[in-house]
Regions:
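Short beta-strand element of Class I
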Residues: 81-85
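Conserved SAM-binding loop of SAM-dependent methyltransferases across substrates and taxa
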Residues: 68-80
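C-terminal substrate-binding/active-site "lid" region of AdoMet-derived donor-dependent transferases
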Residues: 141-202
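Conserved class I S-adenosyl-L-methionine
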Residues: 58-67
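S-adenosyl-L-methionine
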Residues: 87-128
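Conserved alpha-helix/loop element of class I SAM-dependent methyltransferases that forms part
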Residues: 40-57
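Core SAM-dependent methyltransferase catalytic element
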Residues: 8-14, 188-224
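A contiguous loop/helix-start segment that scaffolds small-molecule binding in enzyme catalytic cores
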Residues: 1-38
Length: 224
């Protein structure tokens, strides 16, 4: 009998059809690219969040309160080696994140079904954290901040006054920048066109200092 080779190579060319919808790799995919139940970081805010999260090759993102998973998915689309752990308490939304990830080309995205901050225990150390939901959970932002690598980026969004208060306190303790977004889209008003305002969103973003890491290396004699 003829022995079969151990390795078989199969190449498949995927050619887009004439009505295929091209999706770029720049942050800010259309909202309808994601299956969602309304719990979605909208396109303009998502593009802003990703610019501040600043994905680089090989880096890991925690997407906390993932909703539809849009931020974590776009993080992974930035570079083939980028990784995401999406944390979502709702089982239907967690399953939806997995479907969106598979459909948008990042099936290796990891979904953790659980409630933060408890679900964060034991996760690998992140280079960046996005908190899109659950920001009022006691101790959540502090745990995310402490988990970050030096130089890591943390971005959190608030749509309620209660969560705004948490972000204001976080800025007072950890520094960073607070921005309020008001986005309006043109919409029909009878036979005319007017501006339809979306709900205002407050964004807190901060970068964890490198100073502490440098000081620790001096104390332990690990400088080069």
């Amino acid at each position: 009998d003829r022995a079969a080779p151990r390795l078989h190579v199969l190449a498949v060319e995927c050619v887009a059809g004439p009505v295929a919808r091209p999706l770029g790799v720049a942050p800010g995919l259309p909202d309808d690219a994601f299956e969602n139940d309304g719990q979605l970081t909208r396109r303009d805010l998502r593009a802003s969040a990703l610019s501040r999260l600043a994905p680089s090759a090989g880096e890991l993102l925690w997407d906390v309160g993932a909703g539809a998973g849009s931020v974590g998915i776009e993080w992974m689309r930035a570079h083939p080696s980028c990784r995401t752990v999406s944390v979502e308490a709702d089982p239907e939304r967690a399953a939806r994140v997995e479907r969106n990830a598979a459909r948008l080309g990042v099936p290796s995205l990891e979904v953790v079904h659980g409630r933060a901050p408890q679900a964060l225990e034991g996760l690998p150390q992140p280079d960046a954290v996005f908190v899109g939901g659950g920001g009022t959970a006691p101790g959540l932002l502090r745990q995310c901040w402490e988990a970050l690598r030096p130089g890591g980026r943390l971005v959190a969004h608030a749509v309620t006054i209660e969560t705004e208060r948490v972000l204001i306190d976080a800025r007072a303790e950890f520094g960073g920048e607070l921005v309020r977004f008001h986005v309006e889209h043109a919409d029909s008003i009878g036979s005319f066109t007017g501006w339809a305002p979306a709900r205002a969103v407050v964004q807190w973003c901060a970068v964890k200092p490198l100073v502490a890491a440098v000081a620790d290396s001096w104390e332990t004699g690990e400088t080069s």
